Amino acid sequence: MAKLRITQIRSGIGGTRNQRETLRTLGLRKINASTVRDDRPEVLGMIATVTHLVRVEEVDS
């Protein structure tokens, strides 16, 4: 299964509550924080919610 590195590039301040909670669920708390997640439909849906706040890169397992 592919892995995704998700990096927060913009603040969640000023966003909707749903966007802020999605960042927290992804494990992102500060700008430039990164987390590695599996490439799953649930994660892709969360990324779609905050696509303007994060950068996504595929990494080797």
Swiss-Prot record:
Coiled coil: none annotated. InterPro entries: Ribo_uL30_ferredoxin-like_sf, Ribosomal_uL30_bac-type, Ribosomal_uL30_ferredoxin-like. GO terms for cellular component: cytosolic large ribosomal subunit. It comes from the Bacteria. One of its GO terms (molecular function) is structural constituent of ribosome. Keywords: Ribonucleoprotein, Ribosomal protein. Part of the 50S ribosomal subunit. This is Large ribosomal subunit protein uL30. It comes from Parafrankia sp. (strain EAN1pec). The gene is rpmD.
